[in-house]
Swiss-Prot record:
PANTHER family registered for this protein in UniProt: UDP-N-ACETYLGLUCOSAMINE 1-CARBOXYVINYLTRANSFERASE
GO function term, MF aspect, one: UDP-N-acetylglucosamine 1-carboxyvinyltransferase activity
Keyword terms of this UniProt record: Cell cycle, Cell division, Cell shape, Cell wall biogenesis/degradation, Cytoplasm, Peptidoglycan synthesis, Pyruvate, Transferase
Name of the protein in its database record: UDP-N-acetylglucosamine 1-carboxyvinyltransferase
Gene label: murA
GO BP term, pick one: cell division
Organism this protein belongs to: Haemophilus influenzae (strain PittEE)
Amino acid sequence: MDKFRVYGQSRLSGSVNISGAKNAALPILFAAILATEPVKLTNVPELKDIETTLNILRQLGVIANRDETGAVLLDASNINHFTAPYELVKTMRASIWALAPLVARFHQGQVSLPGGCSIGARPVDLHISGLEKLGADIVLEEGYVKAQVSDRLVGTRIVIEKVSVGATLSIMMAATLAKGTTVIENAAREPEIVDTADFLNKMGAKITGAGSDHITIEGVERLTGCEHSVVPDRIETGTFLIAAAISGGRVVCQNTKADTLDAVIDKLREAGAQVDVTENSITLDMLGNRPKAVNIRTAPHPGFPTDMQAQFTLLNMVAEGTSIITETIFENRFMHIPELIRMGGKAEIEGNTAVCHGVEQLSGTEVIATDLRASISLVLAGCIATGETIVDRIYHIDRGYEHIEDKLRGLGAKIERFSGSDEA
C-alpha cells in the first residue's frame, strides 16, 4: 500500500494548473449512458474514481477510451448489460448514478449498494424515492438496488426531503427521457449540477433552473451525441489556496473559476490572505504572515463546502486564535482531527462541532488518511510541520487529486511516494 513521505517547513509558492472537477466528471460520465450517439469529454481528470467509472461503463457495453489528447470518448449506442457489479461498485458511492440513466433509457437496471469514503451516513434512499416517484419499481435484493419500469418514466413534481447533490443528479438524469415535465423542488445548487445539466442540454435535454433550488425538466424521446469540457475543480482550487495560506506562500491557481468559490475566498480573506481573481485564475498571497483563525459552518452550496472543511481545520490548527468549526452536512467527518492532534495540534470535538486552538508549529509523525479530504489536509500539514511526516492509506488521495505530488513539488513541497513494503 502506497504512502507519502513529506519533509516539512516548506513555504508553498508558485503556479498550479487546476484539473477538471471529479464531482462533475463522474455524473457526466454516467449521464452518457443516456446518449444514442458518441460523446467526447475533455478536461476529465485522471483519477482512480474516473477509471472505476469507465470500467463500470465498459461492463455495461459502453465503448470508453481516452485519446492521445486525454479526451474521453464514449459510445453507449450498444449497451447490452444492465448491472453495475459489486466488484467495481464497492469502492465508490458515485456508482449509484448508473441506475437512473439505465432505467430511463432501457427501462431496467441494477446497481450493487455502493462503497466509498467512510464519512458517515450517505444513504441512497433519496435516489430510490426519486426514481419511484417517476414510476420505477425498485427492490433491494442480495445487495443490489434493482429498478425497472414497464414503459417510459413519467414526469412529476418531486420535493427532495433533504438537500442532496446525488439525488438531484439522479432525478435530473432520469427525467430527461421521461414522458412530460418533471419539477425538482429543494434541489441542490452545486456548480457540478449546473455542469451536468449543461452537458445533458447539449445532448438535447430540456433542463432549466439548474443552479437554483427549482429545476424543471421537459422529457424528450432521445438524447444524441455532443462534446463537452468538464468545469474546473473548485475543491482542488481551494486546497491549493489553503497550501499557500498555511505556509505564508503565494500560489496562482490557473484554469479555474472564482465564482464557484465565493464562500471559501471570503474566509481566506478573513484569515488575512490577499486574494486576487481574474476570469480564469485565482492568486492568494499570505505575504509571509500567519493566518488568523476563522469560524466555519458547512452548508449546501452556495454556503461553505463540506469538502473544504478538513483543509480549513488545518488552517485553524496553525492560525492565531481560537475557532469553531461546525459540520452540518456529514456525520463522522472529523476523523482528521485526532491525526492533526498527534502532530501537535490542539482541538476538542463535541458532536458536529470542533474547537481549534491555533499553535505556532506542528511536528512531523506517522498519520493515517481516513477519507479523501482528510488525507490531503494531513499531507499539507506535513509540508509545514517540523521533521518528517509519513501519510498512510493515500489511495484516498488518488481517488480525488490528479498528480498531487507533482503539483505540490511544483510549489516547493518535498514529498515522495513509496510502497509500504519499501519502508525499511
